[in-house]
């Protein structure tokens, strides 16, 4: 098991079922050292208000030896790469994930989807693109992977895509992983947990990576320090409380 999980939702996204405390308890039980809460951006119908993200600044950094990153899974809004995260929200957040969600950006043709995703990557506002292998959104995988490598943005392999949602993602995700490998980019693994019980579960992701001989040194979840080094290289100030993770 990798000790870092970068994608999960709490009861603040009302189609999810666990609290921050639930995730901390599961992290201790499963040996997770660092995790990110990434509730849906406010343009989703059941997402928290933008004040929720601003007020994450009051969260403790470490509880019982487990580090907590303040994050968001923002929505890609248009072909210009705008996301529903702005202003003071950025000041409170450590990790910005962004992806396509049908209520905010309906599936378009391959060229339009690709344009929107690459514009988001190039914006400088995002660290990870969530579930880029979603079969509802055809993209130019090679072009996206090359843009992500250029701009130091990770592409996610999402465990939930193979179990609960986005059915038919396997072939696309293998293509994504191979393209990231060839471009020299990063992948991020996400459980996309909507209940704490699936936190840290990456078994299906690892099958995808194994199938393309993906280099472990380009997986962000291998250690807290690797992930933190990545975020710091993107401009995040070092977080003193995480020094011993």
Curated annotation (Swiss-Prot):
Top class in the EC scheme: hydrolase
Alphabetical UniProt keywords: Hydrolase, Metal-binding, Zinc
Extent of the signal sequence: none
Binding site for Zn(2+) 1: 7, 9, 73, 192
Regulation: Activity is stimulated by YcdY.
Any one Gene Ontology molecular-function term assigned to this protein's record: phosphoric ester hydrolase activity
Keyword Transport part of the UniProt annotation: no
Binding residues for Zn(2+) 2: 15, 40, 194
Residues holding Zn(2+) 3: 73, 101, 131
Superkingdom of this protein's organism: Bacteria
Parts forming coiled coils: none
GO CC, alphabetical: cytosol
Keyword check for RNA-binding: no
Cofactor note: Binds 3 Zn(2+) ions per subunit.
Cofactor(s) the record lists: Zn(2+)
Classification via Pfam families: PHP (PF02811)
Biological process annotations from GO: bacterial-type flagellum-dependent swarming motility
Matches recorded under Gene3D superfamilies: Metal-dependent hydrolases
Assigned EC number: 3.1.3.-
Observed effect of gene inactivation: Mutants show no swarming ability.
Membership in a protein family: Belongs to the PHP family.
Task of the protein: Hydrolyzes p-nitrophenyl phosphate (pNPP) in vitro. Involved in the swarming motility process.
Subunit structure, as described in the record: Homotrimer. Interacts with YcdY.
NCBIfam families tied to this protein: PRK09248.1
Protein name: Probable phosphatase YcdX
Lineage: Bacteria, Pseudomonadati, Pseudomonadota, Gammaproteobacteria, Enterobacterales
């Amino acid at each position: 098991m990798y000790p870092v999980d970068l994608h999960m939702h709490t009861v603040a996204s009302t189609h999810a079922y666990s609290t921050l405390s639930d995730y901390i308890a599961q992290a201790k039980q499963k040996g997770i050292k660092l995790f990110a809460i990434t509730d849906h951006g406010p343009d989703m119908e059941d997402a928290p208000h933008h004040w929720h993200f601003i007020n994450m600044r009051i969260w403790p950094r470490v509880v019982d030896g487990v580090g907590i990153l303040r994050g968001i899974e923002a929505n890609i809004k248009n072909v210009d790469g705008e996301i529903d995260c702005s202003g003071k929200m950025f000041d409170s957040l450590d990790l910005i994930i962004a992806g396509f969600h049908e209520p905010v950006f309906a599936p378009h043709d391959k060229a339009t989807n690709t344009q929107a995703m690459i514009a988001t990557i190039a914006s400088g506002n995002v660290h990870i693109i969530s579930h880029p292998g979603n079969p509802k959104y055809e993209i130019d995988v090679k072009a996206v992977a090359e843009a992500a490598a250029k701009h130091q943005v990770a592409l996610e392999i999402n465990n939930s895509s193979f179990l609960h949602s986005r059915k038919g993602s396997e072939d696309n995700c293998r293509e994504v992983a191979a393209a990231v490998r060839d471009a020299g980019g990063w992948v991020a693994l996400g459980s996309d947990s909507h209940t704490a019980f699936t936190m840290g579960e990456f078994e299906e992701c690892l099958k995808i990576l194994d199938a393309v001989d993906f280099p472990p040194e380009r997986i962000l979840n291998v250690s807290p320090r690797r992930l933190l080094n990545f975020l710091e290289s993107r401009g995040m100030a070092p977080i003193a409380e995480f020094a011993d993770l």
